[in-house]
């Protein structure tokens, strides 16, 4: 049984319903982080593989990294977490392969479909640290995490994926959010470059965050960044 599944959402709850319906392996806990009041009080119960999801309703967009971190903190006893985008639909056998391949005693990352659907263990978090909430509200938090994974020499396991992924569904469905992302994505690129001494995907020069020689989980939550990068409420 998959111990915990975490999925943030900002809009398009119909895609979330499809994702949950595609879960074809038992899951102990499903945590939905609702960042945009997408799931109203009158919405039918969210169910995946017979398990009713716990929905955390937030008054504003916490951001991807903070949502993933919150899901982990809400299920601290889980040996591992499956973290997914709401616009994924799993294929038959995808989650069964994950259960066959994952070793909760190991630190690493199990990639079902890149960082749109992946699993990490408590040992991964202990080694790598939590997701960097200074990257807000979305884009680059996955690259930053995998940069730390790779620097520590932790393995990437390719589980395989036979399902479907819409891709960037949140911003493509809303021109206001798409415009806001144009600003915040560039701001997150600049933050990433400060943190790693160069641009993402090959230009990095630092081997520790901010070249400070500390733990890989070294990051700073900056209130000014949260204010500047906040997307409009929808």
Predicted segment positions?
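Short beta-strand-to-loop acidic/aromatic patch adjacent to the donor-nucleotide binding site
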Residues: 78-89
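A conserved acidic beta->alpha catalytic loop
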Residues: 22, 32-45, 88-89
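Conserved nucleotide-sugar donor-binding
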Residues: 116-129
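Short beta-strand/loop segment that forms part of the nucleotide-sugar
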Residues: 28-37, 56-58
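Glycine-rich, basic loop-to-helix element that forms the pyrophosphate-binding segment
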Residues: 58-75
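Conserved donor-nucleotide/metal-binding helix-loop-beta segment in metal-dependent transferases, i.e.
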Residues: 95-109
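Short, well-formed alpha-helical segments that are part of the catalytic scaffolds
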Residues: 11-25
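C-terminal catalytic/acceptor-binding lobe
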Residues: 137, 143-234
């Amino acid at each position: 049984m998959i111990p915990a599944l975490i999925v943030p959402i900002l809009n398009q709850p119909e895609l979330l319903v499809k994702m949950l319906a595609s879960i074809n392996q038992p899951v102990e806990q499903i945590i939905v982080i609702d960042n945009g009041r997408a799931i109203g009080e009158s919405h039918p119960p969210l169910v995946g593989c017979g398990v009713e999801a716990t929905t955390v309703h937030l008054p504003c967009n916490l951001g991807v990294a903070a949502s993933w971190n919150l899901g982990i903190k809400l299920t601290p006893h889980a040996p591992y977490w499956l973290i997914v985008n709401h616009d994924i639909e799993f294929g038959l056998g995808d989650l069964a392969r994950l259960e066959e391949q994952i070793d909760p005693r190991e630190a690493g990352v199990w990639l079902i479909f890149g960082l749109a659907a992946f699993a990490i263990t408590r040992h991964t978090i202990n080694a790598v640290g939590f997701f960097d909430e200074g990257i807000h509200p979305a884009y680059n938090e996955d690259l930053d995490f995998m940069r730390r994974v790779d620097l520590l020499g932790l393995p990437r396991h390719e589980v395989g994926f036979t399902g479907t992924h819409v891709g960037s569904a949140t911003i493509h469905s809303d021109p206001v959010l798409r415009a806001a992302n144009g600003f915040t994505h560039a701001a997150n690129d600049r933050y990433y470059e400060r943190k790693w001494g160069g641009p993402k995907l090959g230009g990095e020069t630092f081997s520790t965050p901010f070249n400070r020689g500390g733990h890989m989980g070294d990051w700073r939550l900056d209130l000014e960044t949260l204010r500047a990068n906040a997307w409009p409420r929808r």
